[in-house]
Amino acid sequence: MTTPGKENFRLKSYKNKSLNPDEMRRRREEEGLQLRKQKREEQLFKRRNVATAEEETEEEVMSDGGFHEAQINNMEMAPGGVITSDMIEMIFSKSPEQQLSATQKFRKLLSKEPNPPIDEVISTPGVVARFVEFLKRKENCTLQFESAWVLTNIASGNSLQTRIVIQAGAVPIFIELLSSEFEDVQEQAVWALGNIAGDSTMCRDYVLDCNILPPLLQLFSKQNRLTMTRNAVWALSNLCRGKSPPPEFAKVSPCLNVLSWLLFVSDTDVLADACWALSYLSDGPNDKIQAVIDAGVCRRLVELLMHNDYKVVSPALRAVGNIVTGDDIQTQVILNCSALQSLLHLLSSPKESIKKEACWTISNITAGNRAQIQTVIDANIFPALISILQTAEFRTRKEAAWAITNATSGGSAEQIKYLVELGCIKPLCDLLTVMDSKIVQVALNGLENILRLGEQEAKRNGTGINPYCALIEEAYGLDKIEFLQSHENQEIYQKAFDLIEHYFGTEDEDSSIAPQVDLNQQQYIFQQCEAPMEGFQL
């Protein structure tokens, strides 16, 4: 028997008669659920501050009342974005006016170009260190802001470019600037720190170790303009993100109280990033899940499953799904928030990734106790799951298969009969021909649970006939199980052999009926025998 762990929760001990709840509950598997791609599509880990059209025609005016318009004329960029000797000379001059003018010119290079010359900037000796030095100029907030903007855009680049900003000592200074009296400076510092934390787990942990959280959370305690709140919660989500390794929970858990009220902000960007942060914090052991539950966010997360923007629904669903990977009591908290009605609605979503995530979430609920399985039945969810099992994309069918097999593993006799009456046997048999060995095992396990119930019924009613054997044969399941006796996976062929021997008896095999392989559909093809037109000759 393999050792339990996050990566093998799904397939532990298939030789057992049933999976226990801890084994049936499944945390996310990166490989199967294509999370990295989805996250890239729905959430940016780095953002470049690009000048707007208005900013291209006039110098920026710091929004705080204490700022005055910079009295600097627009300067022409060098052809091709090349850094000129004049720019370098001005950046190192002692004149504050020339320093600001040159910094603005660097900023424009890094924010206006489709492919900003970040490498050229960081390879110019002393320039990055000079911008970091400008961050300290409390007497010149405009210079602080412009240099912070430059460094933000450098940190929006690749890991090597981000590391240059870190090595120049910018992070502790940016954290100090979170307490600046000027909101523009604060906001640009938040943006820079979000880019740095979003680069890698190593950068994230370094920013956390520099004690960013207290001043960052303090920003939320006052009335901010919307862009500030957006940037701050985005930076917060980057600080919570990452699994290899996750951030030290004690360092990020203080943000839970702030996240709980951010869920009630109406802006979709704020909502989305707050939900992403909660999904990261709830992705782990039960003690982390409990901390998220204790923050009082569950009911609001469930409400957000019905939001009209998928940008919010996706991370809210991820967070809800992570919470139900916990124990039965933790799962019940979500059920008590009327989550099943929302999940049923999401099963008909036109967005396939939402359907898949909803099926995954339900599969962890059906891994619970019989009362919880009954709530799924009462919510009329299984008909939708069986429909998905027959018609959806394969990645979604896989999750629906888990939901149904989990219910057959932990359900009562009446609950399993209900699933059979809904028609779960045929789609489970259809999965026996797919190339994904894990899902073949899931389907075999579900069928075994059904056959075991049939055996008990046969003994109880004295007929000696297992009523479910015939249903499996009618669905061409027996042919498929027989073929699996030659499967390359040892657990699959052993399971197939055991099922044939125990429930169907032994029959001579005909090698001529071995199925062909359809590589496009990732499954085997079983030819259905047809009678001759004139009928069989006796």
UniProtKB/Swiss-Prot annotation:
GO terms for cellular component: cytosol; dendrite; glutamatergic synapse; NLS-dependent protein nuclear import complex; nucleoplasm; nucleus; postsynaptic density. Residues 245-437 are annotated as: Binding to RAG1. Disulfide bonds: none annotated. Residues 20-36 have a biased composition (Basic and acidic residues). Residues 149-241 are annotated as: NLS binding site (major). It comes from the Eukaryota. One of its GO terms (biological process) is skeletal muscle satellite cell proliferation. PROSITE patterns: ARM_REPEAT (PS50176), IBB (PS51214). Residues 318-406 are annotated as: NLS binding site (minor). InterPro entries: ARM-like (IPR011989), ARM-type_fold (IPR016024), Arm_3 (IPR032413), Armadillo (IPR000225), Importin-a_IBB (IPR002652), Importin-a_IBB_sf (IPR036975), Importin_alpha (IPR024931). The keyword Lipoprotein does not apply. The modification Phosphothreonine is found at residue 3. Consists of an N-terminal hydrophilic region, a hydrophobic central region composed of 10 repeats, and a short hydrophilic C-terminus. The N-terminal hydrophilic region contains the importin beta binding domain (IBB domain), which is sufficient for binding importin beta and essential for nuclear protein import. The IBB domain is thought to act as an intrasteric autoregulatory sequence by interacting with the internal autoinhibitory NLS. Binding of KPNB1 probably overlaps the internal NLS and contributes to a high affinity for cytoplasmic NLS-containing cargo substrates. After dissociation of the importin/substrate complex in the nucleus the internal autohibitory NLS contributes to a low affinity for nuclear NLS-containing proteins. This is Importin subunit alpha-5. It comes from Pongo abelii.
